[in-house]
Swiss-Prot record:
Keywords, comma-separated and alphabetical: Cell inner membrane, Cell membrane, Hydrolase, Membrane, Metal-binding, Metalloprotease, Protease, Transmembrane, Transmembrane helix, Zinc
InterPro entries referenced in this protein's UniProt entry, alphabetically: HtpX_protease (IPR050083), Pept_M48_protease_HtpX (IPR022919), Peptidase_M48 (IPR001915)
Lineage top rank: taxon: Bacteria
Molecular-function GO terms, alphabetical: metalloendopeptidase activity; zinc ion binding
Swiss-Prot/TrEMBL cofactor(s): Zn(2+)
Amino-acid positions noted as binding Zn(2+) in the UniProt annotation, renumbered to this chain: 146, 150, 221
Catalytic residues (UniProt): 147
Gene: htpX
The protein's name in its UniProt record: Protease HtpX homolog
Entry keyword annotation includes Heme: no
EC number per UniProt: 3.4.24.-
Transmembrane segments: 19-39, 41-61, 156-176, 192-212
Amino acid sequence: MKPFTFYEAIEANKRKTWIIIFVISILLFLVCYAIVSYFELGEFGILVAFLMVFFVNYYAYKNSDEIILKYSGVREPTKEEFPYLLNVVEGLSIAAGIPTPKIYVMDDPSPNAFATGKDPKSGVVVVTKGLLDLLDRLELEGVIAHEISHIKNYDVRLQTVAAVMVGLIVILGDSLKRSFYYSRRRRDKDENILGIVSLVIAILAPFLATLLKFALSRQREYMADANAAMLTRYPEGLASALEKISKNFQPVKRANTMTAPLYIVNPLKGGMSNLFSTHPPIEDRIRRLRMMGERWKLLDKEG
């Protein structure tokens, strides 16, 4: 496989991201349509379904930051405590063309970091004490650039909306399955093609949507890696940081399944198969970053 540029990696991941979001949206529509058709709710039912989707998304969008920070148990560092951290975040924010995000530290020995914020104006970068103790400045720059890329690319907003959509698909699909099995109308619909199709949608849509949510999370990690490499012009910094984090891994105590996709590496115990993982394999991320570095060196020699 030939080395690829930052721009090629970013564009490829953008395309994959929007394909995934489109397919999740189609699955949500299919589940809503199956419910409306099965219960013969008509136009009113469709309106109620879409209003529910809108309000749940809006609530998640407005409150996600506060909920995440509250559950993570973070604190604001002082300038005297970590002066280099504040300098790195400020410098990379200027380079990325976004307002300097708020910085928080989590007193946890596990080396990890995450970003949150609905948009660049409300961006937040959180790093663990373990990360600050482990990495040198160039490696820390790679990690911070990765998190700033998440903020610049509106990844938290995207992940929140996707998570809510998938959650709705799972809830609605489960409700439809229960109704199919226990409704008084079941006898009348056993041989009905619409009833069978609705049941198939109720079973498959939640499973497929969950897989797509994980795939979306992995694509955004690849994209943030590529953006970080472009921002620092030094892919090896992030590659080396990921290598160290992998070798010194331990679970983050305050992490949970809700916040896990936000971290630079999976903060929870145990690994999962690629299809069900929120993060790409670290080895693959390191390999891609070093391939970008090789391509950059070749372009420098040619130019």
